[in-house]
Amino acid sequence: MITLCLSALRGLHRAGGSRIRLRMTLGREAASPLQAMSSYTAAGRNVLRWDLSPEQIRTRTEELIAQTKQVYDTVGTINLEDVTYENCLQVLADIEVKYIVERTMLDFPQHVSSDREVRAASTEADKRLSRFDIEMSMREDVFQRIVHLQETCDLEKIKPEARRYLEKSIKMGKRNGLHLPEHVKNEIKSMKKRMSELCIDFNKNLNEDDTSLVFSKAELGALPDDFIDSLEKTDEDKYKVTLKYPHYFPVMKKCCVPETRRKMEMAFHTRCKEENTIILQQLLPLRAQVAKLLGYNTHADFVLELNTAKSTSHVATFLDDLSQKLKPLGEAEREFILSLKKKECEERGFAYDGKINAWDLHYYMTQTEELKYSVDQESLKEYFPIEVVTEGLLSIYQELLGLSFEQVADAHVWNKSVSLYTVKDKATGEVLGQFYLDLYPREGKYNHAACFGLQPGCLLPDGSRMMSVAALVVNFSQPIAGRPSLLRHDEVRTYFHEFGHVMHQICAQTDFARFSGTNVETDFVEVPSQMLENWVWDIDSLRKLSKHYRDGHPITDELLEKLVASRLVNTGLLTLRQIVLSKVDQSLHTNASLDAASEYAKYCTEILGVAATPGTNMPATFGHLAGGYDGQYYGYLWSEVFSMDMFHSCFRKEGIMNPEVGMKYRNLILKPGGSLDGMDMLQNFLQREPNQKAFLMSRGLNAS
């Protein structure tokens, strides 16, 4: 689902607090106030610390702000005739790197620390720094010097990436309203600060939510014993079930008691309902107002300007066309699910209401998979112990991309369950970066799956390269006595997807931090990781990823073939649900006065054909709305058009473990980071314009 980038340069990929991008440039002679931070930017080192106390976080936040502001103040007073590439554009890159690295240590702990006070201090630091980012991004004096540089320097003598950096700086200055009258700029600045705080609070509420429900063993009917044994028991000999993914989805997929599923679904989609509904009611109009002041019709128009889709009309056409193509498939899948429900109600003596409720969907989609393809995910997960999956995943990525991974002994980490790996180029031995694996749920931890970019891979002032550092943060089930953590196949797919983002972060080799890693268009950022999901549907790859946790015997070929064949199961309803979320996101960001819960309910009925549960407000739990995907959730489906085209035209055709194709992918898609437009990278790889054929086929549709 989601990557996150925590620097001031980046918006978030999946969820988490919204980041205002620090886009201004600074002069080289102004760099001295940050020399104390030079130890954080040594080439080939991971310089991140995870042991800061709440007081240290607060102190270092103020120090970072003071040091950086002094630099901006100096740059803002450079005489225009003295502005050069060297004292403006180049030094910006130096200072951005230092700022990013320090900021990461201050704002990342809110997502992963086990200490509530550290998380609180980190959240406050994030808010404070986000306000500061906005102040600095709207410094007209610095912007004037960037504009003057563009007008006076010989652009032909500047490297292409530096020229792109300059152009993007001008573009972002205008998108911040620096060309507008003073009173308008002040209004925009004030609203942006408020928007930033609202986004951080929205996702903090979700991360800190600790709602749980209590059920008897009978109320958890049909759930496997190992799952029930893993639950915390109450004094009344009942079981505590949280709303975290490792609890929620097994209950929704396997529990045969409709009332239990209803209670879980109701609770899941009313998480933070009161506070986050209020936040959305403030956030959406603020976004709309800022867009209007900047000259855009809607907030969606504002954000799409920088994406490959370019316009709301292109997005609407894409979603509506796909919805119509999937409509017959969705109807057929709903009819089959209703037949399953009717039959089960008769067998179990339940009242049959003649409809699919929201709490029925996962349950009967799971039954569909088991009946049509003889795939039982609960039994299948015994072949996916996390150690075996991790070993296989790392092996595949190393072979495919020409890399080697080495686990770091006694690594400095934020929790004892976290591991750290170093990534090297297999041919040259060059260290490219490091990544953390944080695999299990904890109280207060970010509760979805994401890749966080922590340290940018870019050039330093002395011309050496800072290595990239990323963290893969997921929430797989904890190991229990006598049994390791076992992954469902969809969790294996999630693991592959998020690790694809990690590889994008590590393999990018850019000059500027602004273009490092996953800093590409939001509707292109999922392309590399989605493409790599295809490996978990390949029989040979699955053999590398699996082994029974008890005796080590492999999955039978027959079961592997059934699993691969099941890829198309429920694809109509699953894709229609993505369209629902995309349409809701677009609607709320083209008409901020709409009621979010009502809009979601409308599209659930019209497109998915399954009504939302009355009293719930799914958008209040939808972290993407406040996490950098505002007006851009369509990007998941949009980018899958590109990822499927790449896979089927190159990897499927020439061999999915073909090292030449893997290196071509690494060099043409991953290595440029955001230094090239996404569509240019794609066409370089495909040697043609992309098309939808492979994507439509992956959805069980006729490509013609």
Swiss-Prot record:
It is found in: Mitochondrion intermembrane space; Cytoplasm, Cytosol. The active site is at E498. Residues 1-37 form a transit peptide. Its EC number is 3.4.24.16. It comes from the Eukaryota. PROSITE patterns: ZINC_PROTEASE (PS00142). It is an enzyme of class 3 (hydrolase). Zn(2+) binds at H497, H501, H504. The modification N6-acetyllysine is found at K664. This is Neurolysin, mitochondrial. It comes from Mus musculus. The lineage of its organism: Eukaryota, Metazoa, Chordata, Craniata, Vertebrata.
